[in-house]
Amino acid sequence: MKKSTKLLAGIVTLASAMTLAACQSTNDNTSVITMKGDTISVSDFYNETKNTEISQRAMLNLVVSRVFEDQYGKKVSKKKTEEAYNKSAEQYGASFSAALAQSGLTTDTYKRQIRSAMLVEYAVKEAAKKELTDADYKKAYESYTPEMTTQVITLDNEETAKAILGEVKAEGADFAAIAKEKTTAADKKVDYKFDSGDTKLPADVIKAASGLKEGDISEVVSVLDPATYQNKFYIVKVTKKAEKASDWKKYKKRLKEIVLAEKTQNIDFQNKVIAKALDKANVKIKDQAFANILAQYANTDKKASKANTSKSDQKTSSDSSKDSQSSKSKSEK
């Protein structure tokens, strides 16, 4: 049931955003609560809660959601939103409804949260495509390992994993047979094919496999399962490894996918794209209680400006130094 407590990071803020939106669309004097001798109005509730951290984040989410729906809404179909929702529901299985309820969400509010995330993801990916250079491809190629055929044992206990490692490394051991017998993977799957940029297994497992030669067996790889907050332990054997071509262009399509994935996951790059969208939308904050909710995006522009200014100052300083040296040389002559 631990899985149900981690539906998505920050998911509650969207539900709060909907509450704030409802408050703002209702008459300020509308009573929310009545009691003997007093009432609590929408305005009372709004003023009491707007300065809290969760309300600040909720308003930010609401602004970003509205801006990206306006600018990119036609780029992500409702069908794709439904597919993403269904996939999430499938992953949580029977605990999905409980997870939604515990997070204060309904089916509709969760779908809106998913859609907002998909719109931002689309915008970030499109921006990343425009910045792709040969240097990006070459850098990705340096750390790229082509397709590997592997056998993977998944275990829940470190002591057991270490014991099984001894078994599979023993002379004459049948790794595949031991893997099929011992793995605790839900689907009992042990055979995998992937390259170094794949995500079908944890990154540390793929990294360990990438560093192995054909026929080698890894040490025990410990990975924290984000769904259960429990460690899982992996043992990998590489049974076949494709030889890496000397020309990066052979992998251009795959390298593009890897570079774009890295860029879209980069927080600074995400903030840069969001900042540009907010600027285009001409967002104006009317209530000073929310004056700083966009600060992280304003800082993105300032950092870029500062970096450009620094480069400009360095160039000016360098040019001045050259001029000074030139003048000195002429004077000496």
From Swiss-Prot:
Belongs to the PrsA family. Keywords: Cell membrane, Isomerase, Lipoprotein, Membrane, Palmitate, Rotamase, Signal. Residues 301-333 are annotated as: Disordered. This is Foldase protein PrsA. Its main location: membrane. A lipid is attached at C23 (S-diacylglycerol cysteine). Its EC number is 5.2.1.8. It is found in: Cell membrane. GO terms for cellular component: plasma membrane. Residues 1-22 form the signal peptide. Residues 145-240 form the PpiC domain. The keyword Coiled coil does not apply. SUPFAM superfamilies: FKBP-like, Triger factor/SurA peptide-binding domain-like. It catalyses: [protein]-peptidylproline (omega=180) = [protein]-peptidylproline (omega=0). PANTHER family: FOLDASE PROTEIN PRSA, PEPTIDYLPROLYL ISOMERASE. Plays a major role in protein secretion by helping the post-translocational extracellular folding of several secreted proteins. Pfam families: Rotamase_2. It comes from the Bacteria. GO terms for biological process: protein folding. Residues 323-333 have a biased composition (Low complexity). GO terms for molecular function: peptidyl-prolyl cis-trans isomerase activity. Residues 312-322 have a biased composition (Basic and acidic residues). A lipid is attached at C23 (N-palmitoyl cysteine). It is a lipid-anchor.
